[in-house]
Amino acid sequence: MKSYIAKPADVQRKWYLVDAEGKTLGRLATEIATVLRGKHKPTFTPHVDGGDFVVVVNAEKIVLSGKKLDQKYYRYHTGYVGGLKEISYRDMMDKKPEEVISHAVSGMLPKNKLRSRMMTRLRVFAGAEHTHAAQNPEVLNFK
């Protein structure tokens, strides 16, 4: 008996809705990354982009454990000499709460050519309202 290998044409995508209110950032990001990658499907194939769409709402109400609210920093470099910039988690949540979840999920996806395609299927919204009601997303509950 041969192993089944999914083809890109065979992939059927579903839409899922995740409420981030009161959830821990890392635990939620791992579950979202699993769905984006398609590992929850029995037809998972590593080299085929077979994941589903994920809509995350209430990104501004996500929590971190411990003192990370004050101690966690996001760092990036501008490319110029002395161009290392950093922004605290608290400031990031005030300015762009969607970026916090996107950054965490992106770090949990494989670092290859499929990553950007997987990230385009992640839609994050700061509040409870989202623009994908027409897709009838199925509510996805995590522990």
UniProtKB/Swiss-Prot annotation:
One GO cellular component term: cytosolic large ribosomal subunit
Coiled-coil zones: none
Entry protein name: Large ribosomal subunit protein uL13
Keywords tagged on the record: Ribonucleoprotein, Ribosomal protein
Organism: Clostridioides difficile (strain 630)
Gene Ontology MF term list: mRNA binding; structural constituent of ribosome
SUPFAM superfamilies, alphabetized: Ribosomal protein L13
CDD domains: Ribosomal_L13 (cd00392)
Organism domain of life: Bacteria
Assembly and interaction partners: Part of the 50S ribosomal subunit.
Gene encoding the protein: rplM
Family of the protein in this entry: Belongs to the universal ribosomal protein uL13 family.
Pfam family, one: Ribosomal_L13
The protein's role, per its UniProt record: This protein is one of the early assembly proteins of the 50S ribosomal subunit, although it is not seen to bind rRNA by itself. It is important during the early stages of 50S assembly.
